[in-house]
């Protein structure tokens, strides 16, 4: 992928800014998400809560199922591949998916290397829990970053921790003298020009969404107020009592994230939220996969 293509991919990801991306497992769910105002959907066979409950090895979804969702909606469709599994990424590119998420939700295929995303034309989304991870993924060709959070839990604490960590490290880097940036680039294991960009612009070179544990309109607004440019919602919608109403409320919450009165109205009468798992009760932390 040449520089021009990468810039185009970054612009494609920019178009999702201020939006909500929802996990869906069927064409029917995809239609509900589109009608609710989702800017994109993530097609997968099992949502993170089910992956966590079932355990075992989780892999890329069946391409036939992904195609069914692509045919059902007009908004962009994303799909997940395993960390380091470049052949799964090749398959997803062949079915003409709009975005690929190299995701820690699935079982990693490579515990050393991530995919060289510069070899693909399709834009990639990657998770990060700190600035070093974010910049390393961008250096590999990611066009969009999201917090890792802790998928399938309905517990927002990890997403908050990761977003605050990235913001704190950006502020620290922005305040450095230029002669300190070379050492910082070495420590973060990324090229100097990426570190310089963050120093000068006080932000990542790509969009940064929040993901992992978003279950309510309040959760979505919290992540936006902390600096997220959009939100991924996985298990929180279709594991709740009234998915359609909750989906609409979360989309509106992202748009009106600074208005507590609107957020109060949106939070009323949504039915039961997903049950959720407390961070302290989890044996397997997916966020620790892929550094």
Curated annotation (Swiss-Prot):
It comes from the Bacteria. Pfam families: SOR_SNZ (PF01680). InterPro entries: Aldolase_TIM (IPR013785), PdxS/SNZ (IPR001852), PdxS/SNZ_N (IPR033755), RibuloseP-bd_barrel (IPR011060). Pathway: Cofactor biosynthesis; pyridoxal 5'-phosphate biosynthesis. PROSITE patterns: PDXS_SNZ_2. It catalyses: aldehydo-D-ribose 5-phosphate + D-glyceraldehyde 3-phosphate + L-glutamine = pyridoxal 5'-phosphate + L-glutamate + phosphate + 3 H2O + H(+). CDD domains: pdxS. In the presence of PdxT, forms a dodecamer of heterodimers. Belongs to the PdxS/SNZ family. Coiled coil: none annotated. The active site is at residue 80. D-glyceraldehyde 3-phosphate binds at residue 164. HAMAP family: PdxS. Its EC number is 4.3.3.6. D-ribose 5-phosphate binds at residues 23, 152, 213, 234-235. This is Pyridoxal 5'-phosphate synthase subunit PdxS.
């Amino acid at each position: 992928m040449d520089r021009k293509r990468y810039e185009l991919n970054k612009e494609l990801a920019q178009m999702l800014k201020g939006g909500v991306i929802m996990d869906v497992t069927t064409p029917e769910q995809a239609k509900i998400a589109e009608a609710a105002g989702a800017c994109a959907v993530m097609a997968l066979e099992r949502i993170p809560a089910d992956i966590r409950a079932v355990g075992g090895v989780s892999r890329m979804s069946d391409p036939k199922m992904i195609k069914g969702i692509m045919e059902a909606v007009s908004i962009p469709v994303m799909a997940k591949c395993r960390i380091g599994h470049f052949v799964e990424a090749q398959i997803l590119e062949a079915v003409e998916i709009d975005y690929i998420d190299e995701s820690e939700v699935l079982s990693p295929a490579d515990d050393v290397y991530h995919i060289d995303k510069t070899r693909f034309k399709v834009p990639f989304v990657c998770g990060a829990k700190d600035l070093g991870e974010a910049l390393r993924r961008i250096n590999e060709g990611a066009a969009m970053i999201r917090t890792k959070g802790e998928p399938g839990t309905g517990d927002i604490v990890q997403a908050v921790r990761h977003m605050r960590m990235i913001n704190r490290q950006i502020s620290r880097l922005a305040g450095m003298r230029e002669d300190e940036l070379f050492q910082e680039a070495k420590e973060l294991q990324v090229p100097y020009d990426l570190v310089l960009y963050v120093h000068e612009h006080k932000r990542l070179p790509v969009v940064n969404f929040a993901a992992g544990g978003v279950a309510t309109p309040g959760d979505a607004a919290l992540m936006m107020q902390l600096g997220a440019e959009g939100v991924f919602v996985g298990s929180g919608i279709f594991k709740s009592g009234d998915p359609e109403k909750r989906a609409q409320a979360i989309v509106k919450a992202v748009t009106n994230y600074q208005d507590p009165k609107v957020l109060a109205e949106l939070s009323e009468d949504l039915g039961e939220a997903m049950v959720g798992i407390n961070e302290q009760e989890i044996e397997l932390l997916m966020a620790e996969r892929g550094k």
